[in-house]
């Protein structure tokens, strides 16, 4: 792996949605779906969905900061999910679907906190941002069938109804960040 890469860990609802969007961002080398922010070691999808672990569904984004900035990644994050709803994204309800930024260093923490302050001041949403900003303790990779889920299952009903609109929104509003033009 490129030693100049940095890592971002984000939670904003179902990890399939975030992974599908971040896979399309230039400067992103890989995206992995997983779990973070909880108290159980090596959680399973079933345990996370039952709400027994404290973990959120997250993605880890490995990116080249010379191509795309951490702030740009966060701008996309705030645009493609609702950061004002506690423990919920659409029909997905539970702490595993919370909005969270798990920072890897103090610089990421500052960028996240400053951006949240800026976005709240702009009154973009009717309610304040509830996104948790916390240090990353551990990241646990999700099961293989969750990796690249949207790319492998674009016609699955959830993907068509929930993931595809987020990908379309990203393509429409962040054209300058696209790796390539959509077909």
Language model features with spans:
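Flexible coil/turn and secondary-structure edge motifs
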Residues: 1-183
